[in-house]
Amino acid sequence: MSDFWHKLGCCVVEKPQPKKKRKRIDRSMIGEPMNFVHLTHIGSGDMGASDGLPKAGTVQEQMRSKCGRDRQWSNSRVL
């Protein structure tokens, strides 16, 4: 009888758990933005004439005045 259990034991191998598939996100799962606060509008007059990019100082001043904070905006990442 022990020979039976020995043979059965060698055939039963623990199978690795299948990797969980990540659920694919589609448009129906995404809702409207929450807690959105419109701070400023950047118009064509705010664009730099030479490079076509916003002038960092002007945009930062507009945002600072709109949000009412005295936060110092970092100039480390200027577009």
Curated annotation (Swiss-Prot):
It comes from the Eukaryota. It is a lipid-anchor. The keyword Cell membrane applies. It is found in: Cytoplasm, Cytoskeleton; Cell membrane. Residues 41-79 are annotated as: Disordered. GO terms for molecular function: small GTPase binding. Keywords: Cell membrane, Cell shape, Cytoplasm, Cytoskeleton, Lipoprotein, Membrane, Palmitate. InterPro entries: CRIB_dom (IPR000095), CRIB_dom_sf (IPR036936), SPEC (IPR039056). A lipid is attached at residues 10-11 (S-palmitoyl cysteine). The keyword Nucleotide-binding does not apply. Residues 63-72 have a biased composition (Basic and acidic residues). Pfam families: PBD. Residues 30-43 form the CRIB domain. One of its GO terms (biological process) is regulation of cell shape. GO terms for cellular component: cytoplasm; cytoskeleton; plasma membrane. Probably involved in the organization of the actin cytoskeleton by acting downstream of CDC42, inducing actin filament assembly. Belongs to the CDC42SE/SPEC family. This is CDC42 small effector protein 1-B. It comes from Xenopus laevis (African clawed frog).
